From Swiss-Prot:
GO terms for cellular component: chloroplast thylakoid membrane. This is Protein PsbN. The keyword Plastid applies. Keywords: Chloroplast, Membrane, Plastid, Thylakoid, Transmembrane, Transmembrane helix. It comes from Thuja plicata. It is a single-pass membrane protein. Pfam families: PsbN. It is found in: Plastid, Chloroplast thylakoid membrane. Its main location: plastid. May play a role in photosystem I and II biogenesis. One of its GO terms (biological process) is photosynthesis. Belongs to the PsbN family.
């Protein structure tokens, strides 16, 4: 394969893995540890 193709594939994989990790952090088990500022300041 050409260098540009390998570079594009590696950047794409990195972007997909980062997006997957962000979604897991936002909606998976670690989301229970996130604080919600709207719940802290109810009127």
């Amino acid at each position: 394969m050409e260098t540009a193709t390998l570079f594009a594939i590696s950047i794409s994989c990195l972007l997909v893995s980062f997006t997957g990790y962000a979604l897991y952090t936002a909606f998976g088990q670690p989301s229970e540890q996130l604080r919600d500022p709207f719940e802290e300041h109810e009127d």
